[in-house]
Regions:
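Short, glycine-/Ser/Thr-/acidic-enriched flexible segments
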Residues: 54-55, 78-79, 123-125, 146
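Short internal beta-strands
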Residues: 70-78, 90-98, 116-123
């Protein structure tokens, strides 16, 4: 457990550090995780977490029916699927650092993206940020507790213990925002 908490791949760790440094200017010029919590904590009770899997397509009609009755937290991989079906999430979350994941944001959905908050881990691939900016999407870069990040004294922005998957990240954010 101790080894895993410090990472299990030095090249992956170096990639995360490099991408964090590259993304740092965007992190400090956008709203912080602490601001997100202070402005949106407790504003609603019901959340729906949408992840990609074999059952997503089957559940789309049901999701569309209840979309206006709950806050939708959406995994990055589900975002283009929801957009295609006109189901607007309130939040889209992403934590992967590989370039392939960035492609979920390489699209222009125009007005559909208005009022969606994109919550992205600060070590994400820079293409993710590039695509979010290109389409004028509102986003926040969030950091988890990591030694190299803590040395930079960015406590003002807050730390988000987000788990190991985007679905877990979504669940934890619903908890931190006091959804029931």
């Amino acid at each position: 457990n101790s080894i895993v908490s410090h990472g299990n791949d030095p090249l992956d760790a170096l990639q995360g550090i490099e991408q964090f440094v590259y993304n740092l200017p965007q992190m400090i010029t956008h709203p912080s995780y602490k601001e997100l919590l202070s402005k949106r904590k407790g504003i609603s009770d019901t959340a729906i977490i949408v992840s990609t899997g074999p059952s997503l397509t089957k559940q789309l009609p049901l999701l569309k029916k209840y979309a206006n009755k709950a806050t939708i937290f959406c995994a990055d991989s589900s975002y283009p699927i929801l957009a295609k079906h006109g189901i607007k999430p309130d939040y889209v979350l992403s934590l992967e650092r590989i370039p392939l994941t960035s492609e979920f944001f390489n699209n222009d959905f125009g007005e559909f993206d208005k009022d969606i908050m994109f919550i992205v881990k600060s070590v994400t691939h820079p293409h993710t940020i590039k695509y979010l900016q290109k389409n004028n999407r509102a986003f926040i870069l969030v950091s988890t507790y990591a030694s190299f990040i803590q040395y930079l004294k960015l406590d003002y922005f807050g730390y988000f213990n987000m788990g190991k998957s985007v679905a877990n990240m979504s669940y934890l954010l619903t908890e931190y925002l006091n959804y029931k």
